[in-house]
């Protein structure tokens, strides 16, 4: 894996996102696929990694796994490796610190994610700016719900929102959304102000993707505190108290996604 070119940095500066096709080699891509299959096979475990589910095609199916780095050393080493750190430092303007990690599985029939910006959900600790690294594990196409971005708005700040924290529908309907169709091993970096969404998976195969969010090191290291607060306010199913209402935290911790 190599660092980025000056022309690629200019693309980042103009658009707020940077797509690097084929950036991982075959060995790295194969390792990621294997590790994600391991995560999927892990049982639900209160107090440890978080597994999230959705209702799709009349059944409960895996939607997301997060907070897994303390339990998977190889994954942790990869995501803090020099090559990724070097790219992030160039994009951030300083050293980056890992803030949160997740895998969205979007299995066959899985629902899409509503249009939103990440920034409102990422500023809990007074941080000013985040970058998310997306790694495509499976081919991401229009049919299976690839990521789509609305270009030209990352420098605008927070955009008009609906009551649930997703983007205002009238604003969404006026935008031209660009689908980013990716292959396994492609990387996509995007900042927390880029409007994005994805459609449902209408294929018979998964569209798995790794998402890792980083913040500038000068804004502090809050990964552990973030997941502790999320677990307390919006825990996974296996930790929930029967009859308790967790909806108040949904706009912060369940923004625009199909998790039940």
Which stretches of residues belong to each language-model region?
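Non-heme Fe(II)/2-oxoglutarate
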Residues: 33, 39-42, 46-50, 194, ...
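Active-site glycine-rich loop that binds ribose-phosphate moieties when present
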Residues: 113-121, 135, 167-174
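Short, conserved beta-strand element in jelly-roll/cupin
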Residues: 125-142, 181, 189, 213-217
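A short beta-loop-beta micro-motif enriched in histidine and acidic residues
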Residues: 118-130, 175-176, 182, 205-206
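Non-heme Fe(II)-dependent double-stranded beta-helix
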Residues: 1-15, 21-115, 121-124
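Active-site region of the double-stranded beta-helix
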Residues: 94, 120-127, 136-146, 153-154
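Double-stranded beta-helix
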Residues: 10, 140-199, 219
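Generic beta-strand structural signal
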Residues: 94-101, 111-113, 129-135, 145, ...
